[in-house]
Amino acid sequence: MRLFLSLPVLVVVLSIVLEGPAPAQGAPEVSNPFDGLEELGKTLEDNTREFINRITQSELPAKMWDWFSETFRKVKEKLKIDS
């Protein structure tokens, strides 16, 4: 009697084990292969916008413009004197 009951149980257990992973445990379904790339692009866009806003709101552009203007003025004066 024990053998009679244990064989079907063994068959059921083996069929469950050998069936493989359930669909939810399998590989994730990829609806669009470019979703990850799109997310990366949006992140890059946000970071770039934040960087540009930070630069435009800082004093760095004004300081650079003043430095270039002063350097250009000095070079111009030096060339005027030498000529």
Curated annotation (Swiss-Prot):
Which GO cellular component terms, listed alphabetically, does the Swiss-Prot or TrEMBL entry include?
Answer: high-density lipoprotein particle; very-low-density lipoprotein particle
Record InterPro entries = ApoC-1_sf (IPR043081), ApoC-I (IPR006781)
Per UniProt, subcellular location reads as: Secreted
An individual GO BP term = negative regulation of very-low-density lipoprotein particle clearance
Position of the signal peptide: 1-26
What keyword terms does UniProt attach to this protein? Answer: Lipid transport, Secreted, Signal, Transport
Among the GO molecular function terms of this UniProt record, one is: phospholipase inhibitor activity
Q: Quote additional remarks.
A: Apolipoprotein C-I is present in acidic (APOC1A) and basic (APOC1B) forms in P.paniscus, P.abelii and P.troglodytes and perhaps also in baboons and macaques. The two genes for ApoC-I arose through a duplication process that occurred after the divergence of New World monkeys from the human lineage. In human, the acidic form has become a pseudogene sometime between the divergence of bonobos and chimpanzees from the human lineage and the appearance of the Denisovans. Pseudogenization resulted when the codon for the penultimate amino acid in the signal sequence was changed to a stop codon.
- PANTHER family cross-referenced by the UniProt entry: APOLIPOPROTEIN C-I, APOLIPOPROTEIN C-I, ACIDIC FORM
Family statement? Belongs to the apolipoprotein C1 family.
Q: What is this protein called?
A: Apolipoprotein C-I, acidic form
What is the originating organism of this protein?
Pan paniscus (Pygmy chimpanzee)
